[in-house]
Amino acid sequence: MAMDEGLELPETVLARLAAEVDACERRYARMQKLTLELLAFYGSRGLHPVLLKGLDSASLYEIPSLRESGDIDLYFSENELFAAIPKEAVHNADNSWSYVFRGVEVELHDHILDIERPSARREAQRIASESPSGSVEGLPAEVRGLSPRMRILLLSSHLLKHCLGRGIGLRQVCDYALARAACDYDRRIFEADCRALGLSRWVAVLDNLCVRHLGLDGNFSASYAERERRRLDSLSDRLLRRLLDEGNFGRESGRGKGALNTFMAFLSNMGFSLKLAPGEAFYTVLSLAKGRLKKPSPSGKTQNRSL
């Protein structure tokens, strides 16, 4: 793709961009290698991990290797989770487990959607049971990923979790916008799922942001009365300011990342959170508080200690 005449970038900038692209592609290749190795390891021990985000989200892009790599997130059924946890794993406030595998952080989850409200969690379990896992484009057939329906719900709920707390990054918003545009799913079912999970207002704000600022087709945003549309515009503008101030744009790296700092971040954002998803905001803070007080141990359970 060529820039318009007069807008060409200086050679020094082009050289830096070329170096960054090369580094990004190398990180992606390493992430792919480690992810496949880890999935094969678990599979050889009779476990059935499902890939969340990461390479699954990268498959949505025209050039997957140009999506910046992050952590490796895997879902295990409740019956398999403790068998998958290595002895060095740390329990997190959100009830996931994390450890480092060859320099890359791995997170293990016993639920797919980042939902805390009890009645909504039951709905999340129902939706997950109706949406079997599938393959991931560009990866071996034995790699299990999410169905289009679950992928979009995961990305939207995960974005909400970050928005309620430390802030969201542009990469995650782009993942969501691409999933909305590219995945084959029934939009009426998606809207019903959002109502059942208490995500309708949040998804409306997120869609508004993606349509107005990221080029998502306006057809993906429902029609609203003028007063409600202005309210959504205002909330998405506020969300955009947070997007530019936090996440990939620098401020997050300066914060403490312990459980107490995470808890305080959620409390400090409560005013905005209550306008987006009040029930989820309340139960997320409650869950984090409980998670700090009680940290379950996998001792006594069958563990995988060979990683």
Predicted regions and their residues:
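Conserved NTP-donor binding/palm subdomain of two-metal-ion nucleotidyltransferases/polymerases, i.e.
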Residues: 1-70, 75-307
